[in-house]
């Protein structure tokens, strides 16, 4: 018999197990199959649906009897992250706001100076995985507990964090790991939002804009300089195009703009980027005096919302809103 050594293969999103009679199934095979299926689901969510709150997850800070009771609440709900991870929050989650601010008082003072000062916080929902259902593993005697027992399941889970928004400077050295800074919207998200604004400035009818001009205008959606300057929200009168040019605009978006955006945010389903695993639920604005927070307001206007295909279909079949 020929001797061989079984080596662990690198997980590949494009491969699934091809079982043949007699094939020995080991850890590598099960991991590869799971990786393939999970990556396909996540890619489907990312590329065809997007990300955001699907339902629920409302953020509130109700009035409290004492400062210690002041809490941030997140209601049950469902969301999809920019990485395509699905997050289900089954029950209301709460966090003591003044306790969190007190634990991070030194770090906040490093960022903003001595209190009092205004603080803006992001409420972020993260996808997490937890190993669970520990079972005994057969093997040699005289092993430690770590070697005898192993988790047999991986449970989908989540984590809710408060992150600092609008810090005046980059985080200095020594900033605690527990204190997270909000990340600005990705270029892809900004371009997608601008894509919707762009079509609000388009009137389909008799035409008037050349194909080249329309192509160049749509291509600007991949230009961060144009987006920083407020384009296309600062467009003046409506652009006149023909019905045939609608397809040209969509084709330019799919064939040229999206590949440029893809190059800035590679489509990696299992990378280490935490921003791909989190979704914004809302922002809190407050005044911190070093002991208690006051004037707390909740702003959910920046929260991305993800409509179901059915809801979008019903909305569009009714003609959608009339823009003025």
Short names for language-model regions:
Residues 178, 264-266:
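Secretory pathway export signals and precursors
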Residues 243, 257-262, 273:
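Extended, basic/helix-rich recognition subdomains
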Residues 267-271:
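Sequence contexts marking disulfide-bonded cysteines in secreted/extracellular proteins
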Residues 2-179, 183-196, 201-247, 251-255, ...:
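Glycine-rich, compositionally biased intrinsically disordered regions
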Residues 187, 273-275:
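Mature cores of small secreted peptide/protein domains
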Residues 279:
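Active-site "substrate specificity/gating" loop of NAD(P)-dependent dehydrogenases
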Residues 282-285:
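Catalytic zinc-binding patch centered on the HExxH motif and its immediate surroundings
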